[in-house]
């Protein structure tokens, strides 16, 4: 596989993951964080950090729009639920394993 083919495959995998998460509006970010250490917000941060290397003027809200398929305000209004005490407790417990992201 050439480097260009690898980049194309990786981009397709990212798009498929984003599309899947856009379809799974029933899955809360806190549950993703608690189970895997990353969530939609992490994807936004990774995307934004990569985009800013290409275009320093890239806005974080553009990454949110791309990952969520809508503005973050729309997502919160339509799909985000209040985290339970158990979810919050688990979030704090698993914090050391959460993704560490810079440059977004």
Residue ranges and their predicted role:
Residues 2-104:
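Domain-level signature for proteins that mediate thiol-based redox and metal-cofactor handling
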């Amino acid at each position: 596989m050439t480097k260009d083919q690898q980049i194309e495959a990786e981009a397709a995998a990212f798009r498929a993951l984003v599309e899947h998460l856009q379809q799974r509006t029933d899955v809360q970010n806190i549950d993703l964080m608690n189970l895997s250490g990353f969530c939609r917000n992490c994807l936004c941060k990774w995307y934004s950090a990569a985009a800013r290397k290409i275009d320093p003027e890239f806005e974080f809200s553009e990454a949110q729009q791309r990952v969520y398929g809508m503005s973050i305000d729309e997502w919160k209004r339509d799909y985000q639920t209040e985290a339970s005490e158990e979810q919050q407790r688990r979030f704090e417990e698993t914090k050391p394993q959460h993704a560490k992201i810079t440059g977004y």
